[in-house]
């Protein structure tokens, strides 16, 4: 089962990716992890990636596609894989298709921007332990304090409203066009496309995914 997850940051993809991986026994492939692993391994592709990144440039689509092909040929991908954060653009999706990387399901997590802002901006973290709270959805027992240690909770820089809104604008400009692209691919019978209502509680979203994926 080969799956692509689409959706803005904060749409709940990470939570559900974990569930899909466990239930269907497929690994999640993140291009960031893949690049780091390739660089560390010192492979030919890894060396190319390192040179580009050391020069402060963006890794080309061709190189990322080559890494994806190499990664999905590994033993743990024999039953499929889950791609999150790639492809991000239509040229990347085209390049994947040309490279013969076919996908069974494209799942779009649909959540309105304002709810995403609400979800992310309300997060509070206890940095030493990694415990995460939410002022509205999962508040600590004492406002602003960690339940276990009583230490101050903080807001991550990435969770500040201005940053979140900037990331949403980027998502709508770059990645949202993929929704139209994969809808057409599904009409042509090349993949299955499903829109998932990401505003529902986690357990309901999970049940919806089980219905879609079988």
Curated annotation (Swiss-Prot):
Modified residues (N6-acetyllysine): 192
Residues at which AMP binds: 31, 36, 57-59, 85-88, 92, 156, 167
One cellular component term from this protein's GO annotations in UniProt: cytosol
Cell cycle found in the keyword field: no
Residue ranges of the region described as NMP: 30-59
Binding residue positions for ATP: 10-15, 119, 123, 132-133, 200
Highest taxon listed in the record's lineage: Bacteria
One Pfam entry name: ADK_lid
Record-given protein name: Adenylate kinase
Organism: Escherichia coli (strain K12)
Lineage, broadest ranks: Bacteria, Pseudomonadati, Pseudomonadota, Gammaproteobacteria, Enterobacterales
Gene name for this UniProt entry: adk
């Amino acid at each position: 089962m080969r799956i692509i997850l689409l959706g803005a940051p904060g749409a709940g993809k990470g939570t559900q990716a974990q569930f899909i991986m466990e239930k269907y026994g497929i690994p999640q492939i993140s291009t960031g992890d893949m690049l780091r692993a390739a660089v560390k391994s010192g492979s030919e592709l890894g060396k190319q990636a390192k040179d580009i990144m050391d020069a402060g440039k963006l890794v080309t689509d061709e190189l990322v596609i080559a890494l994806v092909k190499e990664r999905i040929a590994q033993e743990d991908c024999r039953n499929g894989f889950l791609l999150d954060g790639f492809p991000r653009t239509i040229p990347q999706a085209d390049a994947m298709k040309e490279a013969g990387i076919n996908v069974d399901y494209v799942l779009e997590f649909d959540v309105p921007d304002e709810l995403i802002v609400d979800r992310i901006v309300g997060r509070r973290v206890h940095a030493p332990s990694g415990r995460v709270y939410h002022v509205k959805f999962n508040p600590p027992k004492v406002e602003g304090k960690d339940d276990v240690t009583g230490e101050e909770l903080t807001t991550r820089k990435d969770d500040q409203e201005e940053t979140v809104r900037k990331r949403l604008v980027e998502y709508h400009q770059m990645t949202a066009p993929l929704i139209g692209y994969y809808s057409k691919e599904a009409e042509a019978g090349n993949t299955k496309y499903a829109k998932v209502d990401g505003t529902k509680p986690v357990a309901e979203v999970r049940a919806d995914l089980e219905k879609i994926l079988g």
